[in-house]
């Protein structure tokens, strides 16, 4: 994928005889028309872009799956069910991290390919092809940034709702709302000595231990999920600076206007040069025609004059005298 753009494009005619027959096309190589290389590069470029879009859609699907799992986990009261939900969410986050890293590598590859493509004639910095490729890659990075923000808000929501769930479980067992210190202790460690001692004394060991096991399982799930989401967030943060820089570059209208003006000026200069070449070509064509006419006159005129002179000399020469017959004899 690193080499997205081919630097050569050849079309070899059919016919394996290689006899040099132009009509049959044997062994004849034809140069590509202007812009063929750029067109082929753009085709390959957009194929890679579609592949990256598929990966981004998978990230969105995983984000929705995590959101649904988090909503479903609010009604769970069994440690085993919470453990199964934790395994499912861990698998989703692991898949999201893997896909995010793949997208990151592919975007970096597109950046390198864009830099290499700027050396192709007609595809330099500021050209329409370069602007198209740069804006498309920047759009993909913005989509990835939006996905990052979705996962970040999901992580914050899971952490907040986890504290609410722990508070509800505490209230279910003790009949009292936990203070901030107790809630922080339960949310951060999954354990609470005061909670255990008081609850066991009031309601019995079995029921309380079940609730505590659920809280501990939820704590493990949230802690692991938060760690994985932070890792995913770091993958996105590695590209945040590039996204911001490219966004400013794309939004800088003045820069694009200046580039467009430079292309217009360059095109005007090329038109002036082409017009001069056209005038020069016409001038030399007229000179060549005049020289050719002079040569024709120099070569043909003596021949014509000689032919005319020969005709005149032949018409002016006297006819030979006819001898008179001899007199008759007697």
Curated annotation (Swiss-Prot):
Role this protein plays: Vesicle trafficking protein that functions in the secretory pathway. Involved in plant defense by mediating host resistance to the rice blast fungus Magnaporthe oryzae. The interaction with SNAP32 may contribute to host resistance to the rice blast fungus.
Vesicular side: 306-330
Biased composition (Polar residues): 1-10
Misc remark: Plants overexpressing SYP121 exhibit enhanced resistance to the fungal pathogen Magnaporthe oryzae. Plants silencing SYP121 exhibit increased susceptibility to the fungal pathogen Magnaporthe oryzae.
Family named by the database record: Belongs to the syntaxin family.
Subunit structure: Interacts with SNAP32.
SMART domains cross-referenced by the UniProt entry: SynN, t_SNARE
Composition skew (Gly residues), residue ranges: 12-28
Chain's gene name: SYP121
This protein's UniProt keywords: Cell membrane, Membrane, Plant defense, Protein transport, Transmembrane, Transmembrane helix, Transport
Ranges of the Cytoplasmic topological domain: 1-284
Upregulation: Induced by infection with the fungal pathogen Magnaporthe oryzae.
One MF annotation (Gene Ontology) recorded for this entry: SNARE binding
Biased amino acid composition, Pro residues: 320-330
The protein's name: Syntaxin-121
Residue intervals passing through the bilayer: 285-305
Spans annotated as Disordered: 1-39, 311-330
Tissue expr: Expressed in roots, stems, leaf blades and leaf sheaths.
GO cellular component: endomembrane system; plasma membrane; SNARE complex
Pfam family, one: SNARE
């Amino acid at each position: 994928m690193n080499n997205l753009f081919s630097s050569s494009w050849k079309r070899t005619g059919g016919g394996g005889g290689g006899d040099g027959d132009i009509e049959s096309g044997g062994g004849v190589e034809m140069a590509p028309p202007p812009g063929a290389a750029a067109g082929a590069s753009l085709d390959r470029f957009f194929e890679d872009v579609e592949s990256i879009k598929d990966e981004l859609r998978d990230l969105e699907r995983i984000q929705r799956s995590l959101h649904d799992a988090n909503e479903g986990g609010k009604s769970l009261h069994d440690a085993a069910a919470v453990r199964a939900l934790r395994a499912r969410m861990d698998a989703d986050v692991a898949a999201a991290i893997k896909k995010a890293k793949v997208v990151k590598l592919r975007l970096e590859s597109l950046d390198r390919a864009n830099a290499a493509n700027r050396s192709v004639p007609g595809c330099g910095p500021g050209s329409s092809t370069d602007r198209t490729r740069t804006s498309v890659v920047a759009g993909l990075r913005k989509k990835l940034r939006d996905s990052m923000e979705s996962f970040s808000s999901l992580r914050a929501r899971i952490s907040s709702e986890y504290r609410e769930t722990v508070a509800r479980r505490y209230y279910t067992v003790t009949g009292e709302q936990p203070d901030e210190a107790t809630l922080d202790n339960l949310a951060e460690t999954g354990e609470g000595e005061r909670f255990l001692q008081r609850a066991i004394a009031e309601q019995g060991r079995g029921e309380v231990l079940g609730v505590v096991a659920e809280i501990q399982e939820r704590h493990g799930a949230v802690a692991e999920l938060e760690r994985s989401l932070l890792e995913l967030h770091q993958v996105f943060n590695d590209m945040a600076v590039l996204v911001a820089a490219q966004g400013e570059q794309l939004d800088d209208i003045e820069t694009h206007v200046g580039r467009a003006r430079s292309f217009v000026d360059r095109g005007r200069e090329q038109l002036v040069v082409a017009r001069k070449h056209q005038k020069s070509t016409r001038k030399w064509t007229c000179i060549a025609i005049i020289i050719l006419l002079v040569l024709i006159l120099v070569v043909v005129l003596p021949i014509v004059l000689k032919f005319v002179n020969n005709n005149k000399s032949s018409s002016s020469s006297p006819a030979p005298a006819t001898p008179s017959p001899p007199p008759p004899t007697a």
